[in-house]
Amino acid sequence: MHELGITQNIVAIVNEYAHGAKVRRVLLEIGKLSAIMPDAIKFCFDICSQGTVLEGAVLEILEIPGLAKCRQCGAEIALEKPFGICNCGSVHLDLITGEELKIKEIEVEEVCV
């Protein structure tokens, strides 16, 4: 389960960017073709965030669909797998979206001085 290592890195990155402020929410973008299981990330997030400024934070995951462009005709096609066939018959596709793993937003509590 590589999601544990990925989640540990996500927690470390968010922790660094929070500069000690309590994190309320984290928004991730995960591509549907990335071979990363969002449910496993959510499970690991609850464990990995314990004892950090992320403890209790809400993890939101936005799944990005697979999209490719045909090299032959230029058409864009939706992909459910990391490969496919265009309506023109070509298998020469360039992936546009679907393999993302991004920390898109971090919401922290405002620090009152």
UniProtKB/Swiss-Prot annotation:
- Highest taxon, organism lineage: Bacteria
Q: Where does Ni(2+) bind?
A: H2
Q: Give a GO biological-process term.
A: protein modification process
Q: Reply yes or no: does the keyword Metal-binding apply.
A: yes
Key words of the record = Metal-binding, Nickel, Zinc
This entry's Gene Ontology molecular function terms read: nickel cation binding; zinc ion binding
Tell me the InterPro entries matching this sequence. Answer: Hydgase_Ni_incorp_HypA/HybF_CS, HypA/HybF
UniProt-annotated binding residues for Zn(2+): C70, C73, C86, C88
- Database matches in Gene3D superfamilies: 3.30.2320.80
Q: Name one Pfam family in it.
A: HypA
NCBIfam families hit by this protein: hypA
HAMAP family linked: HypA_HybF
Q: What job does the chain carry out?
A: Involved in the maturation of [NiFe] hydrogenases. Required for nickel insertion into the metal center of the hydrogenase.
Which family does this protein fall into? Answer: Belongs to the HypA/HybF family.
The molecule here is called: Hydrogenase maturation factor HypA
Name the source organism. Trichormus variabilis (strain ATCC 29413 / PCC 7937)
**What is the primary gene name for this protein?**
hypA
